[in-house]
Amino acid sequence: MSKSNQMSQSFVMPNDAVRFATMIMTGQGVSNEDAAIIAECLVEADLRGVQTHGLSRLPVYVERVQRGLVKAVPEMKLEKPVAACASLDGDNGFGFLVGRKAMQEAITMADSCGVGVVAARNSNHFGMAAIYLLQAVKAGYFAFVFTNASKAMPPWGGREGLLGTSPFGAAAPAGKLPPFVLDMSPAVAARGKIRLAEKRGEPIPEGYALDENGQVTTDATAALR
């Protein structure tokens, strides 16, 4: 165990972290298979250095299930009007499950048609976009991922949040070399970074956010108001 000025940190093996997160999610009524998918996505984010989309979000997801904001056992429905396009209704389930299923369906369609496009709706936060990009890359495909987001960013010169951060990503296999993976957002920083700073009692870098008066702030709590 190592210690910083703000808090102590414990280091565990990835497999142990996955088992822990799986146990937490099954305790909320999520099936073993789905809980394992969620856990793997969270741990993968931590392993890639994206702590804002890793296990730090586990308490939030648990709370959302308990409050009835997310379905622990969704009944997703796929509509496929043409051979290479489909629409997936996530039934308000976890975004990880919807995203995984949507990309797998896109891969299946690409296997037979050369391309696959899936639009998902009635979903929730799906974590790190790179997860689904890598899913496609491992199958040998180029991939694009886009998602919407609630309004959070003010337009240039404004102070009211009117624009969503709406992350997007692209990836391409590179043979024996590591794949190209782009996972980004129009925002300066993910809101999760600000939440993590607030949790740790740390200031955020200047330029990350504005307070409720439209002034630049380094106070994470003020930035989240």
Walk through the language-model features, giving the residues of each.
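Generic N-terminal amphipathic, Lys/Arg-enriched alpha-helix
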Residues: 2-28
